[in-house]
Amino acid sequence: MFGLKQFYQNEVRAKLAQELDIKNPMLLPKLEKIVISVGAGAHAKDMKIMQNIAQTISLVAGQKAVITKAKKSVAGFKIREGMAVGAKVTLRNKRMYNFLEKLIVISLPRVKDFRGISRNGFDGRGNYTFGINEQLIFPEVVYDDIMVSHGMNITMVTSTDNDKEAFKLLELLGLPFAKVR
């Protein structure tokens, strides 16, 4: 699984330069990092479930997950400062491209009634975020090892500042966006 990075360097960069009319190759948009995160929600109080969530994300990403803690107390959500509220992993370079390739080729096709990911996940600054409802679409996750079914948010951070260039980059990399009706 090393093909996506070389595909980007050999083919995608040339197409981006042509379609976006960018002369300087250093200004071409590129994928900088992918952040996978999970909010524990109601399960935040149970440390065993938090450990299980972190372990699941670690399996999916191929890198150790960090348990995120609350920055301040919120009485309405029954959260205290310093309490574990989720887990996240930041992927860069080789692991990032391996994860993206696995996501595109293996995991997303396993989603029931999959018609493409939404085009509405761009934030206006060239970053794209989408959610996955269930972690079982990843081949590393074994059903018997799961304590609680949870989804995850996947954020792709690009080097560009506008959504049009980021969309073109992700589309050329092979992300299956939903068709416009």
Curated annotation (Swiss-Prot):
GO cellular component labels: ribonucleoprotein complex; ribosome
Protein keywords: Ribonucleoprotein, Ribosomal protein, RNA-binding, rRNA-binding, tRNA-binding
Top-level division of the source organism's lineage: Bacteria
One Pfam family recorded for the sequence: Ribosomal_L5_C
Any GO BP annotation: translation
Function per UniProt: This is one of the proteins that bind and probably mediate the attachment of the 5S RNA into the large ribosomal subunit, where it forms part of the central protuberance. In the 70S ribosome it contacts protein S13 of the 30S subunit (bridge B1b), connecting the 2 subunits; this bridge is implicated in subunit movement. Contacts the P site tRNA; the 5S rRNA and some of its associated proteins might help stabilize positioning of ribosome-bound tRNAs.
Subunit and interaction comment: Part of the 50S ribosomal subunit; part of the 5S rRNA/L5/L18/L25 subcomplex. Contacts the 5S rRNA and the P site tRNA. Forms a bridge to the 30S subunit in the 70S ribosome.
The protein, known as: Large ribosomal subunit protein uL5
Annotated organism of origin: Helicobacter pylori (strain J99 / ATCC 700824)
Gene that produces this protein: rplE
